[in-house]
Amino acid sequence: IVMTDELVKLVDGDATVIAGVLAHELGHVRHRDGMRMLIQASAVGVLASVVVGDFNSLLATVPVVLGQSAYSREAERRADAESARLLRDAGLSPAVMVGFFEKIAKEQGEHRLGIAIASHPADEERIRFFREAAAQAQR
């Protein structure tokens, strides 16, 4: 897990948000998402090269990108759920992540990728998830 200085600046050094981000990344580690994506990309790449005949062609890379993007969004949702759970277990509100994703959305502005090729769920979806997780934690 790598934490950049840009991330720390973005959240103004807020330790609770940093804890939420680290909990999210820990979710990826626990679910072995990196290894799964590597295996999936390799398998889809081989299949695409067999079907298309030339892996170097742009056409052969399309299934790899689309397949990985869809899997990646699911992996991000699982990691978000892990983050919310770990925050609750530590006595912190998952709501700390709402402000984080609002800042991310503001930073990205007009430079967003279409959902078909985006590797992460839409910021609005993630904000809604963490708001709901915070509301459930208060019950």
List each model region and its residues.
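A Zn2+-metalloprotease active-site environment signal
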Residues: 1-139
